[in-house]
Structures are given as C-alpha cells and as structure tokens.
Regions:
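Catalytic-domain carbohydrate-binding cleft regions of carbohydrate-active enzymes
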Residues: 1-315
Length: 315
C-alpha cells in the first residue's frame, strides 16, 4: 500500500431515506461491502481465559465439558502459548523490560512455550481429531525479535543480517514484510492445525502510510491472505472503523466485571447493526478489575451470552 497524490477533491456521500432503515443499510452494503458469513462452528460455544494453561490442562478442560454433556466448539488459547516470561526480560526489581521495538518484552511472540506445550504438533492433532476449532492470540506490534525460532529465516528474507541480532520492525503496509509474515510466521502454525487467529492489535493508530489505520489494514491483510489461498476467511479482531463488518468476528473486550458493563452490552451489540456490524464476541463473565466474584452476575452474563452473536466465556 502507498499514498496516492491527492488533489483538492473530496468524495461526499449523502443518504436520504426517511424511515427506510433497511433500504439505507442495503445501499450502504453496496458501497462498503456485504457482511461476511462466518463458518457454522462460530455460532457454537467458545471457551477462553487469560491464564497460563498447559496442553494437559486444556485437554482436561475439554473432557470436563464432555463429562457434563456441555457442547464445546472453539478453544481460544491466549498469549501464553508463546514465550512470555524469560528471566532476562525483567530487571532486578522484577519489572518487565522493553524490547527493541519499545514494547513490553514477551507481549509479542511466535516461539512455542515448551514448558506448557511440549508437543504442540500432538496437541493440535488431538484438537482436530476431537473436532475442536483452535484459535490463538497475536500481539504483533514488536515485529520479529532475535529470540524467536523464525528470526534467522525472517531477518534474512527482509535483508537484515541475523548476526546483528537487530529485530525486524512490524510494518504490515510493506508488501514484502506482509508476505514474509504470512509465509514464514503464520502459515506453518496453520499447517499444524491452528484454524484462525485472535488478532489483538492495541498499539499505535497510524502507520508509515498516511491515512492507513493499522487495525483496519491488519484485518484486511489477514482476511485477503486466506481468500487468495482458497481458504474460507475467518478472523477474530478488534474494531478498525466503518467497513469492518467485512471481517466477521469482533472482539469487544477487555470487559470490566460489573453490572453496568453487562447492562451496556445488549445495547452496544444491537446498535452495531446501524453500521452492519453483526458479530461481536464479548468477554462473557467479564475480564478486568473484579470487585469480588458475584455468582448471580456471572449467571446473568451467561444467559445474555447465549443470545449474543458469539458465545465466548472469558471469566
């Protein structure tokens, strides 16, 4: 992607429909694209939690669902699937250091945490054999750091001498970087059995190309990559602005654990239809700042989750 020379011209669209709400939305879809239909399994039960789960614990979890005759369709593996807490990433006070990109060490990662997943190939074979769709979390802002298993191959592909141990900055607007990112980093995980990604971008809002929003463009690149390979696109992502209804499942977290938060979610979900956004995935049960767990709050949240677009527990 690159900037185009712009003259003093601006396109302005006026929509006048009175009470013709459905007609307005239909015409907006002609302009901004149709809502992509997610695969059938996305309307089943998702399980996720921010915790250091091992492969054995996740297998036991799946068996617990079956023992109690509760369906489970999607297993979301949060960021601890990769290296997060190496000793050299902390100072003497136990404070986390920054990496070469200026981000927190361990926030971005592509190297399996073998203490939790000693046999990732075997684990993903097991999930596939048990008809569990697997999604993994990505925080890509730190680029490819020197400790990663893929660093030497990736740095070489980008024209960086691996001996320098210089990280490869993340630049999704660079076609060469984007292609190598898919081919060298992500596609091998998908061949192992990862079904789709939780693209958890939460850093800067601009790119090297003026006017290009990184959240929006990431959603586009991830979706078009699968489309080009003849794979039905599916992405679980953060909202990047108008037009993101083309990229299926939205992540609304990180939700506070409180009654007002639950009270707001039905309104928030319903009004998203005003911009054709139909598939929010909420942190059912909440995620942040618990003031003590309230069993009734959790029960009511589960009830709402059953009627929300995507039923993903997270508490």
């Amino acid at each position: 992607v690159m900037p185009r020379p712009a003259k003093k011209i601006q396109d302005i669209y006026f929509f006048f429909y009175g009470t013709g709400y459905k007609k307005a939305l239909y015409d907006f879809s002609l302009l901004a694209g149709k809502i992509a239909l997610p695969p059938k399994f996305t309307f089943g039960v998702w399980w996720s939690r921010y915790w250091e789960f091992s492969d054995v614990e996740m297998k036991n979890l799946v068996e617990e669902f079956r023992l109690h005759d509760v369906p489970l369709d999607v297993l979301v593996i949060d960021m601890d699937w990769h290296l997060v807490n190496r000793p050299e990433w902390f100072n003497d006070k136990g404070e986390r250091l920054d990496d070469q990109a200026g981000e927190s060490c361990g926030w971005t990662g592509y190297t399996w945490n073998r203490s939790l997943f000693p046999d990732p190939e075997g684990f993903l074979k097991w999930t596939n054999e048990n008809q569990i769709q697997t999604c993994m979390n990505l925080h890509p802002a730190s680029g490819i750091q020197p400790h990663e298993d893929q660093y030497t191959e990736f740095a070489t592909a980008m024209g960086i001498d691996p001996a320098t141990k210089k990280y490869v900055p993340f630049d999704i607007t660079n076609k060469k970087f984007a292609q190598n990112y898919m081919d060298i980093i992500l596609h091998p995980f998908e061949k192992l059995g990862i079904d789709f990604w939780w693209l958890d971008w939460q850093q800067w809002s601009t790119t090297n190309v003026k006017g290009v929003n990184p959240t929006f463009y990431l959603n586009y690149v991830f979706t078009s990559d699968k489309d080009r390979r003849g794979i039905r696109p599916l992405i679980y992502h953060r909202w990047g602005g108008l037009g993101n209804h083309r990229y299926q499942i939205g992540f609304s977290g990180d939700t506070k654990i409180c009654w007002p938060s639950l009270d707001y979610q039905p309104y928030f979900t319903a009004t998203a239809s005003n911009v054709l956004f139909g598939f929010w995935s909420h942190d059912i049960g909440g995620h942040m700042n618990p003031d003590g767990y309230d069993p009734e709050l959790y029960t009511r949240w589960i009830q709402w989750g059953a009627f929300s677009p995507v039923f993903r527990t997270h508490c």
